[in-house]
Amino acid sequence: MKTLYLHIGTPKTATTAIQFFCRDNQELLNRQGYFYPVFEWKYPNVLRTRNAHFLVGDTYLSQEERSLEEEEKVFQEAFGQIYEAFEQYDGVILSDESMWNHGFRIDGWNRLKKELERNIFTIKVIVYLRRQDEFTYSWWNQVVKEGMKKTSSFTWKEMLEKLPVVQLDYYGTLEKIAAVVGKENITVRKFDRASFVGQAIQADFADAIGLELSEGYQIESKVENISLTKSSNEIKRLLNCLPGLDKKRNDLFREYLSGISMNPRNDRQYSMLSEPELREFMSKYEEGNRRIAEEYLKGQDKLFDDSYQVEKKWESGNSLMVEDAVTFFGMVTLSLLKKNEELEHQITTLRYKLNHPFQTVGNRIKNSRKKAQ
């Protein structure tokens, strides 16, 4: 029977690197019986390489704004193309991290279940998990960095209290997915670079779908999604609160702060939680994590490192944040000065042309003749 390989993230586990790998190695995948479709429809802020996004549709829309008829039409068109691919290939690969947080909220799994009932293909779900505190911080960091959302101004404390759409009960979510596809059809991998097959997420994913990488495969050396340092993240969060902030300025702020974050200095020695806070936060998930290790990772005694060691808790206003703030505003000032100089030069040139109209016309005639020759 044909196999649909569905990679569902979770978010913040190098999903883009996996998707680019599948896209860039389409020809080699095809030779080994796999196909990675790239569909023609586009969703806001979603790369086309996220080819399973049709299962959840536009996640930015509220329930009232959604068009179920349009979503169903796209779903049927997508599966029409998938069934055509199955005529030539034994395996079709789909990938989108939104299925983890939104799959049940927006009926993606229910739609998939109906297709499975047709008994045309079997399914293998691949999911990467990272420790809940690390996942939450990485998620918050990304939301703040992107900006332009209500949640982009959340403090760390607010994020922990509200956790919008984030599914941290890994075991509970896996059990719901298992009810649709069967537990035996779920492959759980730890998002831990030290444990990846071949020391690379691409090689590890290939192993998860039954492939062994050969020398011909391309792995993009730089699929960068730079996380802001904790200090730069706090600066960006405060900037997100500015009234009248538009996309152009938001992108500019993000660019500068991402540049600063490329030199993280001692950022890694800080944690957003103290050791007691970390233990309390993780205590909610320890039993579920233990059961995942027992039921999905046969032979492993635990899912994540549970030593919970913390060097220092990060606090706003520390010396690194002061340095980042000074650097950021220095970069903005230099950029404005440079732009001002360019405008002054343009104004000077324009004034000269206005004061010497005949010379300006003569120069244009000379230039046009040179071009004609």
Task: Describe the function of each predicted region.
Residues 1-373:
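Anion-recognition interface
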